[in-house]
């Protein structure tokens, strides 16, 4: 049976460097950091006092006040990015095609803001004061649910939750649904808003975060010898995936083809990557096999690249293991150096950035590489974007629990 081809026809982003695709991509290419001191919560007593917040998003452009009131902030971000992507695609939903359009937008953690506020309310005033909207405003699948309700989409409606791999797994599994013929169009990605007291405090307690409070803009420094952890970021990234012939028939603008998808498990440790990047390497190999390309055809990797001491070395080793000698010829950069780590939304925004890298034939930079770690010896597009030929690119996501995902996007 021949595989149905899947293409990308819509993009949407809300993130620390911009509230739409155009602004975000311009800032990414220019190496603009979105990391700054946190001002949405009181950081008194917090070890870490900075992050990658979404700035000045006017949610009224996307939701009515009544709708917005019933949703946690992470749903706001997911809806904004989802609506952007839907409008960018030019899709028209009709009675005849509604059952062939679905949604798969997840989050790694979900409605922390609502959960924390409700817990405080319960302690202060008791259970009777809990809002009837508490549960539907905080559970992860409600971005997909609200998107399907807004546009009358009657196809598959779900949300995968796999920590930092959430966005990539939602996009990858959505592509499989189209390949298998269960839908013609899927709106897919991830969202997150974890810059709350518990979110910030929890990751700091796990010693996962950079503590560079005196210089937030340079705190996320993948592959730099002085990296000391990741920077927490918020936002959402969503793509519209579409069966190739369906997209051509309606005259859609096609950004690129989602030609491959790979998954793997480290089966090693709750938070640390497997030794030598073995699990991540298998994941990348699986995506290339699924795309029917050889390692020497790959041009660019949008890395997981979180700026953690162990993770950056493991991903470097994984690229060498997956690509062999060709690893010395590709460019592998981390846009997290500018956005921070958006957890469940990371794979979503990075799928958008990888798609745009192919469209514009330019690799985003990894900023803040001041002194490259000798154990990380690949080409990371240090501090400056790189104009180059990109026919095939991988976007990597690796999450707590040893869950790995890679999508491979190709020029079309």
Positions of PLM-derived features:
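Conserved beta-ketoacyl condensing-enzyme motif
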Residues: 8, 29-162, 191-202, 295-311
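Phosphate/pyrophosphate-binding loops at sites that engage ATP/ADP/AMP, CoA/4′-phosphopantetheine
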Residues: 85-97, 247-254, 284-300, 322-326
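Flexible, low-complexity linker/loop segments at domain and module junctions
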Residues: 1-8, 95-98, 291-297, 328, ...
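Active-site-adjacent elements of ketosynthase-type condensing enzymes
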Residues: 43-53, 110-114, 193-220, 262-282, ...
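Condensing-enzyme catalytic core mediating Claisen C-C bond formation in acyl metabolism
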Residues: 5-9, 36, 214-291, 300
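ACP-dependent fatty acid/polyketide chain-elongation machinery
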Residues: 1-67, 245-255, 352-366, 410-412
């Amino acid at each position: 049976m021949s595989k149905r081809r899947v293409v990308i026809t819509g993009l949407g982003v809300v993130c620390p460097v911009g509230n739409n695709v155009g602004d975000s991509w311009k800032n990414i290419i220019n190496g603009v950091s979105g990391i700054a001191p946190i001002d949405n919560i009181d950081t008194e007593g917090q070890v870490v006092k900075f992050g990658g917040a979404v700035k000045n998003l006017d949610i009224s452009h996307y939701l009515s006040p009544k709708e917005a009131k019933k949703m946690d902030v992470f749903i706001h971000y997911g809806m904004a990015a989802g609506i952007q992507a839907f409008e960018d695609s030019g899709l028209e939903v009709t009675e005849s095609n509604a059952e062939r359009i679905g949604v798969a937008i997840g989050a790694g953690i979900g409605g922390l803001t609502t959960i924390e506020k409700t817990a405080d309310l319960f302690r202060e005033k008791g259970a009777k004061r809990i809002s009837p909207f508490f549960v539907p405003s905080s559970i992860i699948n409600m971005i997909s649910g609200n998107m399907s309700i807004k546009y009358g989409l009657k196809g598959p409606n779900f949300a995968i939750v796999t920590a930092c791999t959430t966005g990539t797994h939602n996009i990858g599994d959505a592509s499989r649904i189209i390949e298998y013929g269960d839908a013609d169009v899927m709106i897919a990605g991830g969202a997150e808003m974890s810059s709350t007291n518990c979110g910030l405090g929890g990751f700091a307690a796990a010693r996962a975060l950079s503590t560079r409070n005196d210089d937030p803009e340079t705190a996320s420094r993948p592959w730099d010898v002085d990296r000391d952890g990741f920077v927490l970021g918020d936002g959402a990234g969503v793509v519209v995936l579409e069966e190739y012939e369906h997209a051509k028939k309606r005259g859609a603008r096609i950004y690129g083809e989602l030609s491959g998808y790979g998954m793997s498990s480290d089966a090693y440790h709750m938070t640390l990557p497997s030794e030598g990047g073995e699990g991540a390497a298998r994941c990348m190999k699986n995506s290339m096999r699924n795309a029917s390309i050889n390692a020497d055809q790959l041009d660019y990797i949008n890395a997981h690249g979180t700026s953690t001491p162990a993770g950056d070395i493991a991903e470097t080793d994984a690229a060498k293991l997956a690509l062999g000698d060709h690893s010395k010829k590709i460019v592998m950069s981390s846009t997290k150096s500018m956005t921070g780590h958006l957890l469940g939304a990371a794979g979503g925004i990075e799928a958008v950035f990888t798609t745009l890298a192919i469209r514009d034939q330019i690799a985003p930079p990894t900023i803040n590489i001041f002194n490259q770690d000798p154990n990380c010896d690949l080409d990371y597009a240090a501090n400056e974007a790189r104009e180059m030929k990109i026919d095939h690119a991988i976007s990597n996501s690796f999450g707590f629990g040893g869950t790995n995902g890679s999508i491979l996007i190709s020029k079309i």
